[in-house]
């Protein structure tokens, strides 16, 4: 496996067409929000971004309300992306989150988990999807979560959050971007 090149300004998604549309890839140290309707391809895009990041040698953590480890591996294999070796080598750590606990609005615990993964050596953290958290959490706590993410990004962590469009009002979207 390759070692991460931390001198690069962006991380390739592993797909030249996607990279071109994103200005070369994912900017390192950035906070990215993938927002779209159900079945718009948000998870597929984030999985493609994960693959490119892993291929570039980065260490990733993936918090998911959408998959188990097994279903994630199966879904990615269906996209011709095999991450099993990365999981076994702990270059990709996957944390399934129960939707029921997410609905309690526990964004503080999620932020603590992201912070912990940074301390464990992750370069990039993906959260797919924030939707169950955001739907049951006051706007002020959602803003606080994104402010915490921005602080972690200022320390060099790259964070990619996925959310369904219906979960975020345009007013809240303006506050978090």
Q: What annotation goes with each model-predicted range?
A:
Residues 25, 52-53, 117, 152:
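Hydrophobic helix-cap positions at the C-terminus of alpha-helices
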Residues 99-102, 131-133:
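A short, flexible beta-alpha/helix-coil linker loop
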Residues 1-8:
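Charged, amphipathic alpha-helical linker segments immediately N-terminal to NTP-binding catalytic cores
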Residues 13-25:
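Pre-Walker A adenine-sensing motif
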Residues 32, 37-100:
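Conserved P-loop
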Residues 8, 12, 40-43, 62-66, ...:
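Conserved phosphate/pyrophosphate-binding and hydrolysis machinery centered on Walker-type P-loop NTPases
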Residues 107-177:
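P-loop NTPase motor core
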């Amino acid at each position: 496996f390759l070692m991460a090149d931390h001198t690069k300004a962006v991380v390739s998604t592993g797909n030249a067409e996607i990279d071109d549309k994103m200005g070369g890839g994912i900017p390192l140290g950035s906070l990215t929000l993938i927002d779209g309707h159900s079945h718009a391809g948000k998870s597929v895009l984030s999985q493609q971004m994960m693959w490119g990041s892993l291929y570039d040698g980065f260490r990733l953590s993936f918090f998911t309300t959408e998959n188990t480890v097994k279903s994630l591996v199966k879904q990615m294999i269906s996209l011709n992306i095999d991450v099993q070796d990365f999981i076994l080598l702990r270059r990709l750590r996957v944390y399934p989150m129960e939707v029921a606990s997410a609905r309690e609005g526990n964004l503080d615990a999620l932020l603590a988990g992201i912070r912990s993964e940074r301390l464990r050596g992750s370069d990039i953290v993906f959260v797919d999807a924030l939707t169950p958290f955001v739907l049951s959490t006051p706007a002020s706590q959602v803003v606080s979560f994104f402010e915490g993410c921005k602080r972690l990004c200022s320390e060099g962590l790259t964070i990619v959050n996925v959310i369904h469009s219906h979960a975020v009002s345009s007013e809240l979207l303006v506050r978090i971007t």
